[in-house]
Amino acid sequence: MQIWAGLGNPGSSYALNRHNVGFMAVDMLASEKSFAPWKRAFQGQVSLGQIDQERILLLKPATFMNESGRAIGEAMRFYKLAPEDVTVFHDELDIAPMRVKVKKGGGAAGHNGLRSTIAHIGQSFRRVRLGIGHPGEKSRVHDYVLGNFAKSETDSLADMLNAINQAIPWLANDDDARFMSEIALRRQS
C-alpha cells in the first residue's frame, strides 16, 4: 500500500491557487481512476483505490499548508507504513510551469507543506514536484503561490494533469524515470 498526498489549502477560495496544484493532481486521479468517494479521515479527505496491483490511499490534508504533515503522519502510522511508502504531490517554484519532476528525499526548499511533512515523517518520502514557475522576485512569492493560475495557463495545466493521469501506473510501480519520460512524451504530442 502507498499513500499519495496532495498538498494544498482547504476551501473553495483556494481551489484554483497555484499552491493547490497538489490537490488538483490527486483530485484528477480519484476521478479518472475510479477511486472510492472522498471521505473524512486523518485530519483530511481520503479516497482509496488501486492502480495496477498497488493499493493507493489518496489524501488531501484539511489543515492549512503549514500543518499538512500532521495528516500525512497520522495516515502513515495508522497503516503502519514507512516514509518510503508516501508520495507527496506539491507545487514547485523552481521548476518551469507545468513541468513534472520526481525526487526521493531532500529538504523543504522553502516549501512550508514539505517542511511540515518532514517534521512529521522525516525526509525519505517521494515528491512529485509540479512546476509553477517563479514570479522573479522573492518578495512576490507569497502572492504568486496564493494566486490563481492565469487563464492563459489553463490548457497547459489540464495537459499536465492529464499526462500525469495517463503515466501514473509507472509511479505506482516505482519506476519514477519512466513516469517522467511518459509525461514528457504525452506532452509533446
Swiss-Prot record:
Example of a GO biological process term: protein quality control for misfolded or incompletely synthesized proteins
Q: Where in the cell is it found?
A: Cytoplasm
Q: What is its main location?
A: cytoplasm
Query: Which InterPro entries does this chain map to?
Result: Pept_tRNA_hydro, Pept_tRNA_hydro_CS, Pept_tRNA_hydro_sf
Organism domain of life:
Bacteria
* EC id: 3.1.1.29
Catalytic residues of the enzyme: 19
UniProt site positions, description: Discriminates between blocked and unblocked aminoacyl-tRNA = 9
PANTHER family, per database record = PEPTIDYL-TRNA HYDROLASE (PTHR17224:SF1)
Question: So what family is this one in?
Answer: Belongs to the PTH family.
Q: How does it assemble?
A: Monomer.
Q: Which NCBIfam families does this UniProt record tie to the protein?
A: pth
Q: What is this protein called?
A: Peptidyl-tRNA hydrolase
Which organism is this entry from? Zymomonas mobilis subsp. mobilis (strain ATCC 31821 / ZM4 / CP4)
